[in-house]
Amino acid sequence: MSNSPLANYTLISPNKNSPRNHKIDTITIHCFVAQVTAKRGCEVFQPTSKKASCNYVVGYDGSIGLCVDEGDRSWCTSSGVNDHRAITIEVASDNKEPYAVTEKAYAAMLDLVTDICKRNGIKKLVWSTNKNERMNHLNGCNMTVHRDYANKS
């Protein structure tokens, strides 16, 4: 299993399970709730006391950081089942609703998701407005968000 060549910064978090126990078939995107660089975002997930991580951080400037190898499960969504099958991406955002992201962050996130899907054989991303369909991967749904599993944005 490979990591994205688009990552221009790597700082591996100790907060993970190695290896993941499920084929990658899902993308989970979450807002970081701070306009951080990828480097700063990865640094946040270093303390073991944090008990959280993600596979990638996308910075406000379009930088991409690798926090947890794709072969490993991040601790991102409060659901081990989801995290074992998903690549989890934290995207720098404003710290209040509507949690806006910069154009550079949005473009980098789209490039990263495209790369992840190509490398992992995900032919199509399917979003549902129905939480049950997202959480249970019904009707082809293979996109989830943190708020599906915890009281988050």
Task: Please give the residue ranges for each predicted region.
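Basic/polar, cationic surfaces and motifs that engage anionic cell-wall
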Residues: 1-11, 16-21, 95-153
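Cell-envelope and extracellular/periplasmic
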Residues: 33, 70, 82-98, 114-118, ...
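Short C-terminal domain-edge/linker segments immediately following a structured domain
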Residues: 58-63, 86-88, 118-123
